[in-house]
Every structure is written in structure tokens, then in C-alpha cells.
Amino acid sequence: MEWLAGGVTAPAGFVAAGACADIKGNGAGKKDVALLASRVPCAAAGVYTTNLVKAAPVVLTRGRTETGELQAVVANSGNANACTGEQGMRDAAEMARLAAEALGIRPELMGVASTGVIGVPLPMDRVSAGIRAAAAALSPEGGADAAEAIMTTDTFPKQAAARLEIGGATVTIGAMAKGSGMIHPNMATMLGFVTTDAAVDAAALREALREATDRSFNMITVDGDTSTNDMVLVLANGLAGNPRIMPGSAHYRAFADALAAVLIHLAKEIARDGEGATKLIEVRVKGAATLSDARKAARAVCGSNLVKAAVFGEDANWGRVLAALGYSGAQFDPGRVDLWLGDLQMMRAGEPVAFDEAAAARVLREKEVVFTADLHAGECEATAWGCDLTYDYVKINGSYRT
């Protein structure tokens, strides 16, 4: 696999754009409507928020991906279209209709996504104008603008692209994502849009996306909140001309691993961009009895406010890590645990190890802080990502609606 510059328009046959509709009505000039389209219909799959309260676009798009086919996606930032009742459902459907009309495709082939403030009706006159502007600007170079248009409190757009060989054909995968707050397992944890020119059976695409999501977006946590709006969609248009990837086929594993690598890259970017964050936290758990235990343990440490605050304060308080492991639900013997901060061992076989506080402080001053725990309970391992907890997180979320 080879990494490429770009995002959702890196694969053949995809165009995108971002436009300013001033959805929040503040005249800030921010791009807030994104449009992504393939020149042919695509196999499609999605994963969606586990929050019982689901936004209108989530309900609409989830129903449409059950058919296994989409051709385009329209998304807005600045307004979640969540908790907006029947009018919200009508507005989501109208977004799909307007975008489909501009593209000359059937509305049923449109996915819809929204992100922003909950409980406020969409200003459909502005949204409509934004969709028309985005449609007029569609181009193979528009991926960066689309990635910018889906941002809310993000401090930078998040894109990734990679290519690999499958059956003698070059296959490309591109993606964009947004997210910095309300990021917490389980899926989905943010907005993500993935494109590929691979020929993939819809069932194989669903399986690969679920697997990749479990290894990436479901392994990040910023603040313990799961949004009403989160989704990840993948569209595969088949223009690469590779042998069609089926579940369990010879090429499935290579494709699924490449998809996971792209999503892991974006997941880490989201964790790095956590609201107010100054450091990326990576937690590696090995020696777990089951994969589920490894994932539980890693996520618990990343999600611990005490661990996150200690990392922000550059305090090597490793006891907080062990405490989080203990309440994670993973089964292990605390008397066998080994624990490291970077390359510094903090605990061996359940006993504290003397370490150089100055060296620990140097590790904690880095922009990426890694904890490794060996549970010595089995052979399974997992990695999770998060960020430190800072004063700015409270400032950002204390004034979000303004």
C-alpha cells in the first residue's frame, strides 16, 4: 500500500466541492455545505451512531444504504438537524432531492449527513443555495474544500488517500472525516466519508467497513459523548477494473486492511484534534485474554479523565492507568501486569518499578504520549487513541452555540 496526497477525489470517477451557505447566520464566510459524487452508481455501506436519539439524516441515510447502492452524499455543518421532529425528516429528504436534482440522479441514490447544533431547524433557504453553489463547483480537485465544509470545532480538515494493487489493477481509497468533540465508542463516532474505485460486492463492503471501523473510529475517545448524528459511509464505484471483491475472496483481506489503515489514520487525526487538546494519547494493550478485553482495556485508559488530565499536566501518575484497566471490564490478574510510559517501565508483575521522574517528564512533554500495558492473560492486543483534557475543552463547549 502506498500513501497519496488528497482525499475523497483521489479515486477515479469522484468529484467534490464545498460551499458557503452561512447556515449559522453569522456571516463568518465558512464553507458549510459539502457535496461528493461519483459519475456512476456505487456499492455503498454505512455505520451509524449507537445513540438512541438519532438525527434525521442518520435515519434517512441508514435506510438508503440498506439497498447497498448510493451515488452521492450531501452534508452540512453548523446545524445537526437533530431533535427537529417530522420537519427535520422532511428537510433531510429535501436536501437529498435538491442535490439529486442538481446532479441529475435519482434522490434515492443520495446520502445525507449533518453536524452542528442540536434542536434548531435547518434554514432550508440557505441550505438550498449552498447545495446549488456546491453542485456548480464540483471538480476532481474539490476534495479539500469538501473536507473543510464538514468541519465544526475541528482546527484542521482531515483527509487521507492510499492505493494498492488488486488482481493486476491499481485500486485507490480516499477519505475525509470531521470530529473533535462528542467522540466516543461505539460507532459511529464522527462523520466520515470514504470513496474507492475498487469493484467490491456490497456485502463485502459492509463487512470491510465494520471491521475497519472497529479497528479505528471505535477505538478513539475524546470526551465520552456519542453524538446523535455520527456516521461513516463508503462508496465503491468499480472504475479501477479489478476482479470483483467478494466476502472471503482472495483479494478481500488486502482491501480490508488498506481500508482499515486509511480509517486508522483519520481516527488518530480526530483524536489529535480533540477540542482543546495539546497531546495525542495512544494506549497499547497486549496479552489480553480476548480481543474484546484488549479493546475494552485500551479504550478505558484513553477515556479516563484522570489519565487525560495527568497527561495534560505532564504528571507520570501511572496509578490512574492501572485503575482504568481495573474498571474496564477486561479480565486479568493485577499481580501480573507490566506497564510502560513510552520506553520507561512503571510496573513489573504488578509491582511498582523505580523510574527517572525527569525522563518521564520528557516523555510527557512530547506531542504523542504512549502507554503500553501487558496483561499477561492471553495473546490478544488492541490500540486506542485519545487526547489530553485541557482548560480549553471547557471553554470551547461552554460557548458552543455562540
Curated annotation (Swiss-Prot):
Pathway: Amino-acid biosynthesis; L-arginine biosynthesis; L-ornithine and N-acetyl-L-glutamate from L-glutamate and N(2)-acetyl-L-ornithine (cyclic): step 1/1; Amino-acid biosynthesis; L-arginine biosynthesis; N(2)-acetyl-L-ornithine from L-glutamate: step 1/4
Chief site of localization: cytoplasm
Swiss-Prot/TrEMBL site (Cleavage) positions: A188, T189
InterPro entries reported for this sequence: Arg_biosynth_ArgJ, ArgJ-like_dom_sf, ArgJ_beta_C
Main function: Catalyzes two activities which are involved in the cyclic version of arginine biosynthesis: the synthesis of N-acetylglutamate from glutamate and acetyl-CoA as the acetyl donor, and of ornithine by transacetylation between N(2)-acetylornithine and glutamate.
Family recorded in the similarity comment: Belongs to the ArgJ family.
Protein known as: Arginine biosynthesis bifunctional protein ArgJ
Organism: Symbiobacterium thermophilum (strain DSM 24528 / JCM 14929 / IAM 14863 / T)
Classification lineage: Bacteria, Bacillati, Bacillota, Clostridia, Eubacteriales
